[in-house]
């Protein structure tokens, strides 16, 4: 699976890119029909609190899959997004096997 990681208004982080690649690599091994992923990291301010946003778009057969999450750091946000995408991929897999 091809993974592209972008940092919006942030400095590039090799460790976060490696973390995203590791997590998405696990999804890619579980669902070998996933073609690629676009990961976006962004830090935002809401009510004087820092919120860390992770968005991931997956390319796979059928409509594109998307999930995003805010959390107290990028690792937690990424883990939540991966869980959401795993659920979406399971549903897609079930639909694909029905045909």
Which residues make up each language-model segment?
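N-terminal, polar/charged subdomain of small-to-medium soluble alpha/beta proteins
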Residues: 1-99
